[in-house]
Amino acid sequence: MKHTISVLVENHAGVLSRISGLFSRRGFNIDSLAVGVTDNPEISRITIVAEGNDYTVEQIEKQLNKLIDVIKVRTLPAHEFLQRELLMIKINVGADKRSEIMTIAEIMNAKIIDLTHTTVTLELSDTTYHIARFEEMLKPYGITEIVRTGAIAIQKGSDALQVKK
């Protein structure tokens, strides 16, 4: 089962390396990784998606909490968080198929971000599931290039992962 782990860390060099090293040493695979500075420039938030049972995730949390630069760790409960990825995808398409691509983009709420005589580049921000569905819909047209971010996630409701001010 996939688990989403949110980690607040001190924002300085080497922190991400120590966290990825911990996963590597323990034999845990990272399926998705996203890092960004929070509203406090001294703190970054790392969102990790990893496969494992509850025991494995509990061990990951314990190991992360032992790292000096880690401020807080929380495994986000399934169905209690919002998750998004960003996809940019370039399709090599002639004029005859362009309207089909635009219809798919409209149905999936994707934006056209670049258009040339031979290519259409689309952007979609959505759940991992919908991103994968969109990609599958476009495969028959010939994907020239594809770029995906790691997943980011935030807990639903009033609960928040933050450092008390």
Give residue spans per PLM region.
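Long, contiguous binding/interaction regions
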Residues: 1-45, 49-165
